């Protein structure tokens, strides 16, 4: 199979943040365009020696670490599966706009720093949460089981063009610099 990859894509959401005065931005870690499908991968790193708990439909996940005193400290983190599913839907919509046909899109959460034994997640069927060592095998599995006439890779140029067109990162940096400049001018004027 052939693959193309886009890393660190930033896309504007439909959620307006009134405090910031702009639409919220989603950060897609990796978009992998394979022969048969598009894979939207969210990478999450956890400290070693913790246990991860949660489910697909929970708002948050938790990881617990044991201290030397045999106490357990819980830390709340965003549900990476839920977040990545919404990213995947958006990327699939863009892909459909780019090539005027449905493209299979698969959301995968890639967990770094933990083993399977440390992950205690109740994940819905069709959702993928894998450790780093299993990520490539998971993508190979889908590439061998999905039959979509190589629709994804065949149109990779159109898909990449669309994903890059919709990216807002290049537009955000000048806005941030503009806001910083205005703030510095304001501080100077208020001295």
Annotate the PLM regions.
Residues 1-26, 33, 37-38, 44-55, ...:
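Surface-exposed interaction regions that form or flank ligand-binding interfaces
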């Amino acid at each position: 199979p052939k693959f193309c990859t886009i890393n660190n894509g930033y896309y504007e959401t439909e959620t307006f943040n009134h405090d910031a005065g702009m639409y919220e931005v989603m950060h897609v870690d990796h978009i992998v365009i394979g022969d048969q499908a598009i894979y939207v991968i969210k990478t999450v790193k956890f400290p070693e020696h913790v246990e991860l708990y949660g489910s697909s439909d929970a708002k948050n996940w938790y990881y617990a670490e044991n201290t030397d005193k045999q106490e357990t400290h819980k830390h709340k983190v965003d549900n990476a599966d839920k977040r990545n599913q919404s990213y995947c839907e958006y990327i699939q919509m863009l892909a459909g706009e780019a090539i005027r046909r449905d493209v299979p899109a698969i959301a995968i959460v890639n967990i770094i720093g933990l083993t399977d034994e440390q992950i205690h997640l109740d994940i819905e069927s069709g959702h993928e949460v894998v450790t780093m060592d299993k990520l490539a095998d998971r993508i190979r599995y889908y590439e061998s089981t999905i039959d979509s006439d190589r629709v994804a890779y065949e149109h990779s140029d159109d898909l990449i063009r669309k994903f890059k067109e919709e990216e807002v990162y290049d537009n955000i940096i000048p806005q941030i610099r503009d806001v910083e400049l205005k703030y510095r001018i304001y501080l100077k004027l208020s001295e």
